[in-house]
Amino acid sequence: MFWITPRLGGWMVLAAVMLSGFAESRACIWDSDTLAMEQARFPGTLDVMGGNFPRHSSEFYMWRIERTHVLLAKEPRNLAMRDDLAVALHKLGRNLEAIQVMMESLAIEPKRYETLSNLGTFTIYTGDLPASRQWLQMALAINPNAHFGREKYQLWLVEHLMLRANPQSLPEITDGLQAGIVDQLRENYAEFVMFRQGKISGWMEEDSRGAALRGVLGMMLFADYRNPVLLEALGDILEQGNPLKNAVHMADQAYAFARDLYGENPVKERLNKKIKEANSNYLSKEAPDLKKLKNAMLAAQAAGEALAKRVREDELTWIASGQDAGAEFEKKYLGASMPTVQFRAAK
């Protein structure tokens, strides 16, 4: 995922996903307590899905571009400042310009993790998945445990998408595999993660699922919480595992969000199939828990919109008064009181 400079280090607090063990269960039932159990095990996940966390306005990124251009005129080799510029360009959809900034940084310092990681992210958005894979592999070779070990989940997501687009694209991974296994790897990100971890059948272990959630939720927080690819990947992780330890209600909503954001009918058919499979885990499609979840999601979305409006108003004020909008944002919105996204033990 793209590198956040030290001045924005507070994001690491917001994006932390804590792990703990899960009690073993022997039965498989769903009742009115299911949603409460899911929310207890995955507190904060609905807020991420609904966008209820502090995020910058487009005006902030325009300000940052102007500001870093001025500062870089004085310090053209300041790589951290170049990261700020590139990420701001990326956030405004100017990915080719962001890539150019990082290529210039690469010429200054060829083996810098942050530069390679940024390139791995930006090239995803230009559709060049093979290049993204190469950049991410280079970044991981320098720092295998970057972002608390989350970087590899972005690499695996890129590989999963490459296989989905073309099942022959990664022969070094798929050679010798049965066609049915390759199809599973193409259709479900959680299955691909398990395979890359050396497991080709059964449920995803809880520690593995928690680590994968760290990766996907981190990408949603840092990059784009409304990205349908990330939402589908989140649904795959939430739905996987022991039926009494997964979160099929939340998976249902993640899949539904992804389906609505995708534009192509074949993709929608795949998401409808995943929603149907998630639905099969509870007693009725009209289960009270699902209705409660949808209401909770609407509340998270409304809170997120209100928060985004407040942040934008503050940032416009800071910019107009000549203040450092980045520093002011961090002081006001990324303090120790910010809630974390956690992954707790089942009761």
Language model features with spans:
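N-terminal leader/linker segments that initiate helical-solenoid repeat arrays
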Residues: 25-78
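Helix-turn-helix repeat elements of alpha-solenoid scaffolds
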Residues: 53-66, 90-99, 202-214
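Short coil turns that delineate tetratricopeptide repeat
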Residues: 76, 110, 144-146, 225, ...
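Alpha-helical linker/edge segments of TPR/alpha-solenoid repeat scaffolds
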Residues: 157-177, 275-307
